[in-house]
UniProtKB/Swiss-Prot annotation:
It comes from Citrobacter koseri (strain ATCC BAA-895 / CDC 4225-83 / SGSC4696). Its EC number is 2.1.3.15. The gene is accD. A zinc finger (C4-type) spans 27-49. InterPro entries: AcCoA_carboxyl_beta, Acetyl_CoA_COase_Trfase_b_su, ClpP/crotonase-like_dom_sf, COA_CT_N, Znf-ACC. Keywords: ATP-binding, Cytoplasm, Fatty acid biosynthesis, Fatty acid metabolism, Lipid biosynthesis, Lipid metabolism, Metal-binding, Nucleotide-binding, Transferase, Zinc, Zinc-finger. Pathway: Lipid metabolism; malonyl-CoA biosynthesis; malonyl-CoA from acetyl-CoA: step 1/1. Its cofactor is Zn(2+). It comes from the Bacteria. This is Acetyl-coenzyme A carboxylase carboxyl transferase subunit beta. Component of the acetyl coenzyme A carboxylase (ACC) complex. Biotin carboxylase (BC) catalyzes the carboxylation of biotin on its carrier protein (BCCP) and then the CO(2) group is transferred by the transcarboxylase to acetyl-CoA to form malonyl-CoA. GO terms for molecular function: acetyl-CoA carboxylase activity; ATP binding; carboxyl- or carbamoyltransferase activity; zinc ion binding. Binds 1 zinc ion per subunit.
Length: 304
């Protein structure tokens, strides 16, 4: 045995520290490596560049409503492939895949509860479910939310994140635009506030119906909001669109929305606005609220 081989036989390789999958993630905008639990505590907002990442419907509603007050509505409603639609894949297979991936039956989750002790009904889109597309179940759940708000005589808040009407349901999905808008007319007749929160992205038939019908239309920073996408518009008009076209900041400059609110400030802002509209005492910004306990950051960051 040569002297090199003798040295090699005495070398014990160090064991690489194992980090469970999913502990770290990267910001979609700046590429910063982020601790997953800290990002969740910060409501999926990058602490470095303030990029607002997409948030699941349930996490959004749980971050909005008071702990212990949440009651889900319309969970028994499930989509059906009435048309036996098929493109590159059967619609029923797309539904099964989306339901397995997200754990949701469809793209809208509705809950009633309290916000700073004020009764409200809130709805949020699950964009991971077929791009948050609006089908008959989404329309039915939204109408259920309106009916509950009317019954409880309380405000309604909807967080939109959708690519538009669901093409696999054809005319039935387009009918939801009129159905949801007609339901909101009853809120207006009763004088109950409806606040629409536009998140990234809010497009197509959703933006052309209830997403833009709020008594107050609020957007998150840099959210893409419009009907057709920028690429489609450029190809149609054969012109270069201005920078930031269809983003929140562009829309507020043109008067299309009322305000832009950062996600960490959204809960208190909504409570303050609704308290004024409902002639109730202003919420206490220092009121304690139970939150998640975040485990300590691991010593070793993942390799780039």
């Amino acid at each position: 045995m040569s002297w090199i081989e003798r040295i090699k036989s005495n070398i014990t390789p160090t064991r690489k520290a194992s980090i469970p999958e999913g502990v770290w993630t990267k910001c979609d905008s700046c590429g910063q490596v982020l601790y997953r639990a800290e990002l969740e505590r910060n409501l999926e907002v990058c602490p470095k560049c303030d990029h607002h990442m997409r948030m699941s419907a349930r996490n959004r509603l749980h971050s909005l409503l008071d702990e212990g007050s949440l009651v889900e509505l319309g969970s028994e409603l499930e989509p059906k492939d009435v048309l036996k639609f098929r493109d590159s894949k059967k619609y029923k297979d797309r539904l099964a895949s989306a339901q397995k991936e997200t754990g949701e039956k469809d793209a809208l989750v509705v809950m009633k509860g309290t916000l700073h002790d004020m009764p409200i009904v809130a709805a949020a889109f699950e964009f991971s479910f077929m791009g948050g597309s609006m089908g008959s179940v989404v329309g039915a759940r939204f109408v259920r939310a309106v009916e509950q708000a009317l019954e409880d005589n309380c405000p309604l808040i909807c967080f939109s994140a959708s690519g538009g009407a669901r093409m696999q349901e054809a005319l039935m999905s387009l009918m939801q635009m009129a159905k949801t808008s007609a339901a909101l007319a009853k809120m207006q007749e009763r004088g109950l506030p409806y606040i629409s929160v536009l998140t990234d992205p809010t497009m197509g038939g959703v933006s052309a119906s209830f997403a833009m019908l709020g008594d107050l239309n609020i957007a998150e920073p840099k959210a893409l909001i419009g009907f057709a996408g920028p690429r489609v518009i450029e190809q149609t008009v054969r012109e270069k669109l201005p920078p930031g076209f269809q983003r929140s900041e562009f829309l507020i400059e043109k008067g299309a929305i009322d305000m832009i609110v950062r996600r960490p400030e959204m809960r208190l802002k909504l409570a303050s606005v609704l308290a004024k509209l409902m002639n109730l005492p202003a919420p206490n910004p220092d009121a304690p609220r139970e939150g998640e306990v975040v485990p300590p950051v691991p010593d070793q960051e993942p390799e780039a």
